[in-house]
Amino acid sequence: MSDAPDPSSAANTMWGGRFAAGPDAIMQAINASIGFDKRLYAQDIRGSRAHAAMLAAQGILTSRDAEAIGEGLLTVLSEIEAGGFPFRVELEDIHMNVEARLKELIGEPAGRLHTARSRNDQVAVDFRLWVRDQCDAAISGIEALMRAFLAQAEAGADWVMPGFTHLQTAQPVTWGHHMLAYVEMLARDRSRFVDARARMNECPLGAAALAGTGFPIDRHMTAAALGFDRPTANSLDSVSDRDFALEFLSASAICALHLSRFAEELVIWSSAQFRFVRLSDRWTTGSSIMPQKKNPDAAELLRAKMGRVLGAAVALFTVMKGLPLTYSKDMQEDKEQVFDAADTLMLGLAAMTGMVGDMQANRESLAAAAASGFSTATDLADWLVRELNLPFRDAHHVTGTLVARAEARGCDLPDLSLAEMQEVHPGIREDVFAVLGVENSVRSRTSYGGTAPDNVRAQAARWKELLGDAA
């Protein structure tokens, strides 16, 4: 026996009045969204209760009907949250499933709930409420990760490590400075979600199908009841707008990119070739054949999963790019992308917060790597400019020549003798060696935003104050 719903049943009594026959079973499968939009149940019920209260306040519903609707919707909410609600695919979506159950519970008044409302504005408000909640969750998750990076920055404000360009040693920096770079990225991520939330905080409920309604509704009342700043100002835009979802996905994609970048660094840094960090057993796995292995699987999986967030953004941009005003059924494809991106991002933020909180920096390996690869060559060039008044380009050439000599000898710059240096430029003095140490190098980078330990401590204190964590 087929599990497909019977097209001749009363499955589509919500809209089937002008149809002589029900939809094909395959059409029902294509059309149904209850498999994923049931996640909107709380927002749908919240919106419906606000709508019913407004209708009663405006004299469109009796207070008795509005009370029955409100209590019935709370019963539906309890049933769904208890896990026993019978979602029915033939009812297509969360809106019809809730309304059908409400009718079973309270009878005729349930049919009055949809007065002055369409599924077009209903889903628009449900989805906005859900995405708004996810913005709040993302902001909270980002702040937790910022605090984890700040703790690492404070602990390692003066731990020297190599800074890289092209994944090659460039100049010495501090561990704390590197950690604060991610705090800056995450702060921008946070601000993007804050901005997106502010822009989406307008209520589309009451726009109806696309043209508004002739009923004397109070859209400001429903907007206030649902925590929106104001109602949307154009009914056509209200039901066709998915900018709020696109902005959420855009902010999520950029944040995911930042998580992926640090995940990549963790994979590299935890390798035997680098040994910069030790990852906790909680975030690593072993090998089924190689007993010695400790694989950074959490970082690798996070690096891969973050690509799904970018993919979700591209997918929804692609759905929306060719749609005329106002609503098209294409827009039903908006939710799965947003749901998956939100789930993936929140998982990534939680995992990264745990990894950053648990990771242990190997100070010896960091310092040894910082001192290799001619990392203080720029300090030497700066000394030549500052002490010998050489033009920087000349100083750059002199330093490059000295690097080549050291490389030929198989040593680093501090291992060259003063006499060898003076063969390249006779003005070089003994005090040049003071600038060739990595500790002196990082201490000298005192320009605003530089890597000097005092700068790192000041920036960490600033961020703690901004996050409300200052002592």
UniProtKB/Swiss-Prot annotation:
Protein name: Argininosuccinate lyase
Organism, as annotated: Cereibacter sphaeroides (strain ATCC 17023 / DSM 158 / JCM 6121 / CCUG 31486 / LMG 2827 / NBRC 12203 / NCIMB 8253 / ATH 2.4.1.) (Rhodobacter sphaeroides)
One Pfam family in the UniProt entry: Lyase_1
PANTHER family per UniProt: ARGININOSUCCINATE LYASE
Gene Ontology, cellular component aspect: cytosol
Family: Belongs to the lyase 1 family. Argininosuccinate lyase subfamily.
EC numbers: 4.3.2.1
Gene that this sequence comes from: argH
Keyword Cytoplasm: yes
CDD domains assigned: Argininosuccinate_lyase
Catalytic activity field: 2-(N(omega)-L-arginino)succinate = fumarate + L-arginine
Pathway: Amino-acid biosynthesis; L-arginine biosynthesis; L-arginine from L-ornithine and carbamoyl phosphate: step 3/3
Classification via InterPro entries: Arg_succ_lyase_C, Argininosuccinate_lyase, Fumarase/histidase_N, Fumarate_lyase_CS, Fumarate_lyase_fam, Fumarate_lyase_N, L-Aspartase-like
Record's subcellular location: Cytoplasm
NCBIfam families in the cross-refs: argH
MF terms (GO), sorted A to Z: argininosuccinate lyase activity
GO biological process, one term: L-arginine biosynthetic process
Gene3D superfamilies documented for this protein: Fumarase/aspartase (C-terminal domain), Fumarase/aspartase (Central domain), Fumarase/aspartase (N-terminal domain)
Keyword tags: Amino-acid biosynthesis, Arginine biosynthesis, Cytoplasm, Lyase
Main location: cytoplasm
Keyword Ribosomal protein on entry: no
